[in-house]
Amino acid sequence: MYGIIYPKTTNLEITDNMDTIILDHQLQETLVFPDPSFPIQYYVDDLHQWAGRQVPLHWHFGYEFFSAVSQDIEVQVGNEQLMLLKGESILITGGQLHSYRLTSPQEPCLCPNIVFSDNVLAPLTSTVFQKYLRHILNDSALPCTIISGQEDWQREISECLFRIYGIFTAEGNLCDTAPDHAPVKSMHSDCPEIDVHLNLFEIFKILYCHRSELHHIKISRPDQKTQIRLQKMLHYIQTRYPEKLTLE
């Protein structure tokens, strides 16, 4: 899923074995789901396949669950610098700038994740979305939520999430990753779409019931625009001035 391709005018070179993602001039990734009627996709990202062993800042309108199964992962969401410990997962809501960086170059770093739109849960105008889901997915003070497993309800969420990963693994819906590299045990389902839907709903039911325990922060739009400009400036410097810069 990941890697980075800037517009053709940037002169960025990409090796054949690098994972790629198409971003526009605002660092937005345009999501295209294989099945628009069931808009959810499963990926396993190997952060070793990235330049600098990191997924650069980008954003998209879909929601994302990302899990650290092999090692701790440095995560940036907006201005927040977070450490996702091995065994933890993070939910990042739509429209948030985010990036990932591995911490142990010598260790494997396969990270299962899912990206999905609100339509896979419920229509935006439905009672279910307006009464329950929007409090988690559309709260500007809740750009991300770490699922640490320290509490029983967090462990329940992790179990639901990894059941979803397992169902997709069993179905062979593993984007850009060889089956023998799958970091999650496959889980057969006679009704995979229904089971994925049920587990997603259970996750958000739990989050809603424990919403008062979630860590709320504020990420403003001006901050996001500033980060986009800074990221583009750094990319310009890195590609046009490969020599070490000094103040002399």
Model regions: which residues?
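A short beta-turn/loop motif at secondary-structure boundaries
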Residues: L57, L82, P105-Q106, Q224
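Short amphipathic alpha-helical/adjacent loop interface patches that line ligand
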Residues: D118, L161, L200
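Generic protein-terminus/edge-of-domain signal
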Residues: M1-L91, G95-Q96, Q130-K131, A141, ...
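Short, Lys/Arg-enriched, Trp-marked, Pro/Gly-tolerant hinge/linker segments that flank
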Residues: P143-R155, Y165-E248
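Short, solvent-exposed loop/turn segments at secondary-structure boundaries
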Residues: G78-N79, L102-S104, C191
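Ligand-binding loop in jelly-roll beta-barrel domains
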Residues: G95-N119, T127-V128
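Double-stranded beta-helix
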Residues: D118-L142
